[in-house]
């Protein structure tokens, strides 16, 4: 059986989740609003609940790790939000990596969402096989 990974994209209005195999094939996906109550609920609380609900019907022990793309300036070495994107109150300083590792007992990698988009294109998308690429992303 191939290794399975959980991909989590934390955006300005929604968290998107995908169960992905080691070849990059999406097996299952879901989405949940992060702005449903005007950001009164801390974003990471919403993300954690969404992950819990998403992996419940799947074989969680088979997960090899969690990859998170997040809006804002991300300190990828520590997995912490270093700067805001503007619309998330209380986002700076949030320890995404540590929180999710403690909650789910899996290794977690966190990076900026625009960087992740381009890495995905290089790995399995339109930029596959190219050594020099540029990506432009527009978001909420």
What residue spans do the PLM features occupy?
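Short glycine-rich, Thr/Ser-proximal phosphate-binding strand/loop in the N-terminal lobe
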Residues: 2-45, 49, 81-83
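Short glycine-aspartate micro-motif
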Residues: 5-9, 63-67, 133-137
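Glycine-rich phosphate-binding loop and adjoining helix at the ATP-binding site
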Residues: 40, 44-48, 62, 66, ...
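Short glycine-rich anion-binding loops that position phosphate/pyrophosphate groups of nucleotides
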Residues: 71-74, 139-140
